[in-house]
């Protein structure tokens, strides 16, 4: 049975995720006029595009909300973001820059905590401003039902009656003015913005066109680092981690993780760190484009991955990247709380994050231009003396050891040569490969694998094989 209502449930209480903007203000007033009982819930997620979040619930009453609540989600959102940082749950990357999944993180938190707040008020119907073409409609649907299995969904923008009457911003503003309802006129931007404490997303409108670049965006968490008239002085910053968790910035600790993230945002923001321009696949497989800000996450991520590389071996680092990308995709799809995501998340936090303790010092300049000045920690796998070209005492291995190691490689090199000879005989190896290694005449593999030793050695080898010794 469908959980989605396609028409207004008159006479029933409907919870609306209320931002105080034009869309949700009109939705509340329209539902009240048509006979529903709107109840508004505003999430405080540290959004940088709303400087006066405390005043938002008060505005809802003017539009007919029966009750209006502000739900503080900042601490929960910061914790989920730190989990994403520890697990590397970021799958969208382009030319070395990552999108840190800041919007999907926000949806996981608001999609559950707002519905739980509604449950406290016995509100069983939920609506929000997501549209049918985007990702959020599915994310909110999944998280809402996880938090309240009896939840029903009503979205004004899926109601043909609402869309027919109030199909655009012009119609919405005129509708409010005709009823003498307050309307905060705002300058029409060339793009839309959605933000929380971890980052900001800019998309749609002019940004849908790929002949428009990042310069169109006015950053809300940082500076226009591409503008030469913006002065940005170099700055050194040290980030301390304990068991995969950032605990200090420049040696200072903080009363809460929220305060630490705010400080990281301030430092990264004044250098324009963490802005990226991405083309991505939405959940419905259509491609979209977004320009993202995440100055604090980018700063913490740079320091964290430096420590990951210093502490863990190659296979562990590879698993961290591979499983982190899978986890990032699950989060993007609204599956951050699904069992398959929890399995990946717990494993990465336990076996990768828990070992990450240390301090990294970076010198920030403009945008992504930074240097790592120092990396310190108590349990590194990095030991420069192991590979030093200088003479060292008690070396881990010597020249003779390396000769033996290279000799053991003859087996797989011979296998590769044999396959190349086979492919050459089948006409599969082209001129580009031949130009590198020459003509592939038969017999090369045997020459590589041959030891060239005495007949006595051959007798020993034969005896070992016949006796089954491996």
From Swiss-Prot:
Keywords: Amino-acid biosynthesis, Arginine biosynthesis, ATP-binding, Cytoplasm, Ligase, Nucleotide-binding. Residues 448-470 are annotated as: Disordered. Transmembrane segments: none annotated. InterPro entries: Arg_succ_synth_type2_subfam, Arginosuc_syn_C, Arginosuc_syn_N, Arginosuc_synth, Arginosuc_synth_CS, Arginosuc_synth_type_1_subfam, AS_cat/multimer_dom_body, AS_multimer_C_tail. It is an enzyme of class 6 (ligase). It is found in: Cytoplasm. Its EC number is 6.3.4.5. SUPFAM superfamilies: Adenine nucleotide alpha hydrolases-like, Argininosuccinate synthetase, C-terminal domain. Pathway: Amino-acid biosynthesis; L-arginine biosynthesis; L-arginine from L-ornithine and carbamoyl phosphate: step 2/3. One of its GO terms (cellular component) is cytoplasm. GO terms for molecular function: argininosuccinate synthase activity; ATP binding; protein homodimerization activity. L-aspartate binds at residues 131, 135-136. One of its GO terms (biological process) is L-arginine biosynthetic process. L-citrulline binds at residues 99, 135, 139, 192, 201, 203, 280. It holds the Pfam family Arginosuc_synth. It catalyses: L-citrulline + L-aspartate + ATP = 2-(N(omega)-L-arginino)succinate + AMP + diphosphate + H(+). ATP binds at residues 17-25, 43, 129, 131, 136, 194. HAMAP family: Arg_succ_synth_type2. Belongs to the argininosuccinate synthase family. Type 2 subfamily. Homotetramer. This is Argininosuccinate synthase. It comes from Kineococcus radiotolerans (strain ATCC BAA-149 / DSM 14245 / SRS30216).
């Amino acid at each position: 049975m469908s959980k989605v209502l396609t028409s207004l449930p008159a006479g029933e209480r409907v919870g609306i995720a209320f931002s105080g903007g034009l869309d949700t203000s009109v939705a509340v007033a329209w539902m009240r006029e048509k006979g529903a009982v709107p109840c508004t819930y505003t999430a405080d997620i540290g959004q940088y595009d709303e400087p006066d979040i405390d005043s938002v619930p008060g505005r809802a009453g003017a539009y007919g909300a029966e009750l209006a609540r502000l739900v503080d989600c900042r601490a929960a959102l910061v914790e989920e973001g730190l989990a994403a940082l520890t697990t590397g749950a970021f799958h969208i990357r382009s030319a070395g820059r990552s999108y840190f999944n800041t919007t999907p993180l926000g949806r996981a938190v608001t999609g559950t905590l707002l519905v739980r707040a509604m449950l406290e008020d016995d509100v069983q119907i939920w609506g929000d401003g997501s549209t049918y073409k985007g990702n959020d409609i599915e994310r909110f649907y999944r998280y809402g039902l996880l938090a309240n299995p009896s939840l029903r969904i009503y979205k004004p923008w899926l109601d043909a009656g609402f869309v027919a009457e109030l199909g655009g911003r012009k119609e919405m503003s005129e509708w409010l003015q005709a009823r003498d309802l307050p309307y905060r006129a705002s300058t029409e931007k060339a793009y839309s913005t959605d933000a929380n404490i971890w980052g900001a997303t800019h998309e749609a409108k002019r940004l849908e066109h790929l002949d428009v670049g990042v310069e169109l965006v006015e950053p809300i968490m940082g500076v226009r680092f591409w503008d030469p008239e913006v002065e940005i002085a170099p700055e050194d910053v040290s980030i301390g981690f304990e068991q995969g968790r950032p605990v200090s910035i420049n040696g200072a600790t903080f009363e809460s993780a929220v305060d630490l993230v705010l400080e990281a945002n301030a430092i990264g923001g004044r250098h324009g760190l963490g802005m990226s321009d991405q083309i991505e696949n939405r959940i419905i497989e259509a491609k979209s484009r977004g320009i993202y800000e995440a100055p604090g996450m980018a700063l913490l991520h740079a320091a964290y991955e430096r420590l990951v590389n210093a502490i863990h071996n190659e296979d562990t680092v590879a698993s961290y990247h591979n499983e982190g990308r899978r986890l990032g995709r699950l989060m993007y799809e609204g599956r951050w709380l699904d069992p398959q995501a929890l399995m990946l998340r717990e494993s990465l936090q336990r076996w990768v994050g828990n070992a990450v303790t240390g301090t990294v010092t970076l010198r920030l300049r403009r945008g992504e231009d930074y240097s790592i000045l120092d990396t310190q920690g108590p349990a590194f796998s990095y030991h420069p003396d192991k590979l030093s070209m200088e003479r060292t005492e008690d070396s881990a291995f010597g020249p003779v050891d390396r000769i033996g190691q290279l000799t053991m490689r003859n087996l797989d090199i011979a296998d590769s040569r044999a396959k190349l000879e086979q492919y050459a005989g089948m006409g599969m190896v082209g001129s580009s490969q031949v130009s590198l290694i020459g003509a592939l005449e038969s017999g090369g593999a045997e020459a590589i694998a041959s030891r060239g030793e005495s007949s006595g050695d051959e007798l020993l080898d034969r005896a070992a094989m016949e006796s089954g010794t491996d």
